[in-house]
Regions:
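ATP-dependent carbohydrate kinase catalytic cores
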Residues: 88-118, 208-216, 220
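Generic detection of short hydrophobic beta-strand segments and adjacent strand-loop junctions
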Residues: 22-24, 111-112, 150
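ATP-binding/phosphotransfer module of carbohydrate and carboxylate kinases, centering on a glycine-rich
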Residues: 1-44, 48, 60, 136, ...
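Short coil/turn connectors at secondary-structure junctions
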Residues: 85-86, 119-123, 239-240, 278-279
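Short beta-strand-loop/turn "lid" adjacent to the catalytic site in phosphate-handling enzymes
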Residues: 45-90, 99-108, 125, 251-255
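Glycine-rich phosphate-binding loop of actin/hexokinase-like ATP-binding domains
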Residues: 114-175, 261-267, 271-276
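A glycine- and small-aliphatic-rich helix-loop capping segment at beta-alpha/alpha-beta transitions
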Residues: 14-17, 70-73, 104-112, 139-144, ...
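Active-site nucleophile and cofactor-binding loops and adjacent substrate-binding regions
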Residues: 69-70, 89-96, 116, 125-128, ...
Length: 303
């Protein structure tokens, strides 16, 4: 599971169990070859007849894979030749994590707002982090998207001022990923406080450890943008089976006291309120979705 910040690796044992689970900062490695070699050597893992499933924070286009938010790339053919004589399957990272929804336990899901049960239908998984990923799960198959690169609509005076400032500084229109992400937290706080060179961490801003009114306002704007993104993509994809939110940023941003606000913004629509009000929204607090998704692929498509 190769994100833009962290790389998580594991080996499947006896067709069902994950062993040798480990996590690394991907920036500590110059190449994917270095990373995989380091992992296999660390656990003295057998290299014989290995097959692989990789989820990558990049669009899957041809043989050359280029990550979007970091300077990292690799050749699919070279990686398969060097490490995986048994074959290599490649997925977008959030697409791979989307497969985990096929078997994720209902009792581990946290309902955002009043519970709507577990209706059938397409599902979407949204994971903000270094970037902003979204996958669609339909009839057991997970589909990758680049929905995070949609432009943010102007929905309020506050959002308008933020978007105008972004466009002035960057010479382009802001996308959802620009603001609903790690870099977006810092940018929004800097805009509100007029301190673009502040040294507050994203965690400090979201938890408001300094009792700072700009931190509260930053969080409010982020929840607004998050709920709007969830609403628009739910309408586009027809995800009547639910909207699933995951990743450390989702966990840090959405606390129990924020659920009703998120839900109200999500359902707000003069024409589609009834449709949206029947779509459940869940928060997943689990950093193993990539492994779980890979195991689903392994069990259902490879064995």
């Amino acid at each position: 599971d190769l994100g833009a910040t962290n790389a998580r690796l594991a080996i499947v044992n006896d067709f069902k169990d994950l062993i040798y689970k480990s996590s690394y900062k991907i920036s500590n490695f110059k190449t994917l070859e270095d990373l995989i070699n380091h992992y296999l050597n660390e656990f003295n893992a057998s290299r014989e007849n290995l097959s692989g499933i990789l989820g990558v924070a990049a669009p899957i286009i041809g043989n050359e894979i280029n990550f979007v938010n970091i300077d990292f790339s690799f050749s699919v053919k070279e990686i398969e030749k060097s490490f995986f004589p048994g074959g290599l399957r490649l997925f977008n990272d959030v697409q791979l994590q989307g497969y985990a929804l096929n078997s994720y336990p209902n009792d581990k899901l946290k309902s955002v707002g009043v519970s709507k049960g577990f209706p059938k239908g397409p599902k979407i998984l949204i994971i903000p982090g270094t970037g902003l990923g979204l996958s669609i799960l339909n009839n057991g198959k997970s589909l990758a998207t680049e929905a995070g690169h949609l432009n943010i609509p102007n929905t309020s005076d506050e959002i308008q001022n933020l978007l105008e400032n972004f466009k002035k500084e960057n010479k382009r229109t802001a996308t959802f990923e620009d603001l609903l992400s790690g870099k977006g937290i810092s940018y929004i706080y800097g805009f509100l406080s007029q301190e673009s060179n502040h040294n507050h961490s994203n965690e400090d801003i979201l938890n408001n450890v300094r009792n700072d009114a700009f931190c509260d306002e930053t969080k409010k704007i982020l929840i607004n943008i998050f709920a709007i993104f969830a609403k628009y993509t739910a309408l586009i994809t027809g995800s009547t089976g639910g909207v699933y939110l995951a990743g450390s940023l989702s966990e840090s941003l959405l606390k129990d006291d924020d659920f009703s606000e998120f839900r109200n913004i999500f359902e707000e629509s003069k024409k589609m309120n009834k449709y949206l009000s029947n779509i459940p929204v869940f928060l997943i607090k689990d950093n193993n979705l990539g492994f779980m998704g890979a195991l689903e692929v392994y069990k259902n498509e490879i064995i």
